[in-house]
A protein has these predicted regions:
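Charged, long alpha-helical assembly modules
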Residues: 195-269
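Short active-site neighborhood of thiol/selenol oxidoreductases, capturing the structured segment around
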Residues: 352-381, 395-397
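A non-transmembrane, solvent-exposed segment enriched in polar/low-complexity residues
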Residues: 30-184, 191-195, 199-225, 229
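N-proximal helix/coil linker or "cap" segments that precede and/or mark the start of modular domains
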Residues: 289-345, 350, 356, 386-387, ...
């Protein structure tokens, strides 16, 4: 549970608290020393960890002595952020802030971590400990009001508990704002500012314009509390969720919108190496295998503008090779681009290039008769095609992906009556010619890593959709070829 998390306004969302313990002290010229004492332990290994994205990474480890003391100490300074000490058994941890002062002492009582723990040597963490106590107290009251609200049997009780909840929530937010005002230079103030959400102008929009204005205001002010030159916030539990929410919920899923926002954030972070690295790594991981069709254009953009220019020098050779190979597999098949021509021949050896196919819509199907999934899906694709789309002028360009299976390919075509398809394959001579010219293969051009792989092209062979099931192809065609409803028979009724 995370006490840094913003308190939700809605009564429908459960309030949760994370117990954070702080320890910090007077900084020394070099290195750090973190001491923890607890009579609840007399041996084992404890770990000093820090938050980074969704991970809790181990910074150091040390043995707990018979008196329950453990010391973490090195000559190098810790990078600022939110750290934790994980006790033996890994079932308890103490969270604390690390900034300039890095001599830290914590005397912990696990029977009441918030109220019985003593922190010395760190003004930053003393402030943090007081904040914990306040949040813990208000959190229990908020939970009580929430449960009472759920158990309310009439509107009067519901209204009362909802108001109490709102008042308590305001007290908590006011307390946070006061820390920011009274201790503006503190790390806690910086973190609390980073967490703040934009206040919506019209909390209850009435018109569509109200909703649009709310969205635009929220998006415009989403990053107001974030200083992208402050690397400390990447080592916290709340920064990654804020980034994820922005790109997954706030920004339009259209690739151009994501690209524009990605470039903007990277521009703001370019003078902060760790922040820049964090953002570029996350964006690359998010869009190398995107959830939505077409968003692979974001990954290709990141590769072309950043990775291919040597900017991501922190990546090792294996990582860079994987990113490069994936980018090259996607460059030629982005949604909206013209698909690469396929110079294939039919079963009689007659040349039938893709660009020679005249049709308003062309389904390109890469398949293999020995593929179990193909044996199931290809007949279903054909049934859908005959039932709905053949009469609309749609054509299927079926590409055999394994030349050695030509006899089984012909048998399959005859068995399932696929003669209405344009059935083709690439000759060994053509494959050799392409290889010798060091040109990309059709499997690279179309990112064919499994079969069946389906593409939908328009009359000019631009890619409308790709990597879909036959059902999804059917849905897309339904939208594209949807005929106007004939209302003649309903006239006058």
């Amino acid at each position: 549970m995370n006490i840094f998390a913003p308190i939700p306004q809605s009564m429908k969302i459960l309030f949760t608290i994370t117990i954070f313990l702080a320890a910090f002290s007077i900084s020394i010229a070099q290195g750090y020393k973190v001491t923890l004492q607890s009579s609840d332990y007399n041996g084992g290994i404890a770990y000093l960890t820090y938050y980074y994205g969704k991970n809790i990474n181990v910074e150091d480890s040390a043995a707990v002595n018979s008196k329950g003391a453990v010391v973490f100490q090195k000559n190098e300074k810790l990078l600022p952020g939110v750290y934790s000490i994980v006790f033996p058994g890994k079932n308890k941890l103490f969270d604390f802030l690390v900034d300039k002062e890095q001599i830290i002492t914590i005397k912990a009582d696990t029977s009441d971590l918030i109220n019985k723990t003593i922190v010395t040597g760190s003004k930053e963490n003393i402030l943090f400990q007081e904040y914990q106590k306040f949040v813990g107290s208000k959190g229990r009251q908020l939970q009580k009001e929430l449960e009472a609200f759920k158990a309310s049997k009439n509107k009067s009780d519901s209204f009362m508990h909802e108001k109490n909840y709102s008042d308590l929530n305001k007290e908590l937010n006011d307390y946070r704002d006061n820390i920011i005002k009274q201790h503006p230079e503190s790390m806690l103030a910086s973190l609390l500012t980073s967490m703040k959400e934009p206040q919506i102008l019209n909390s209850k929009p009435v018109t569509r314009d109200d909703s649009i204005n709310n969205y635009q205001y929220y998006k415009k002010h989403y990053w107001d509390g974030i200083t992208f030159l402050d690397d400390r916030i990447i080592r916290t539990p709340f920064f990654l969720p804020k980034v994820e929410k922005f790109f997954r919920e706030v920004v339009s899923p259209a690739p151009d919108s994501i690209i524009r926002e990605s470039d903007y954030l990277l521009l703001r972070a370019r003078a902060a190496p760790e922040m820049y690295k964090f953002l570029l790594n996350w964006l690359t991981d998010e869009y190398i295998n995107p959830k939505y069709m077409g968003q692979d254009a974001v990954f290709v953009h990141l590769f072309e503008k950043y990775h291919s220019k040597g900017i991501s020098s922190w990546l090792n050779e294996k990582q860079m090779t994987a990113i490069s190979n994936r980018a090259y597999m996607l460059m030629s098949n982005l949604i909206g681009d013209q698909a690469a021509n396929l110079e294939m021949v039919d079963s009689a050896g007659v040349s039938v290039p893709l660009y020679g196919v005249i049709a308003d819509y062309t389904i390109v199907c890469f398949w293999d008769p020995t593929c179990g999934h193909c044996r199931e899906e290809v007949p279903r694709l054909d049934s859908m095609y005959h039932a709905k789309w053949e009469k609309e002028g749609v054509k299927i360009y079926g590409v055999l992906t394994e030349n050695k299976e030509q006899s089984k390919w012909r048998e399959f075509i005859n068995k399932y009556n696929l003669q209405s398809w344009i059935n083709v394959y690439q000759t060994e001579e053509k494959k050799k010619e392409i290889d010798e010219a060091k040109k990309p293969s059709y499997k690279q051009l179309y990112d064919v890593t499994q079969t069946p792989t389906l593409y939908l092209l328009d009359k000019d062979k631009h890619i409308i959709a790709k990597k879909l099931t036959w059902q999804q192809i059917d849905d897309v065609l339904e939208m594209k070829i949807k005929k106007p409803v004939n209302n003649i028979n309903n006239a006058g009724k």
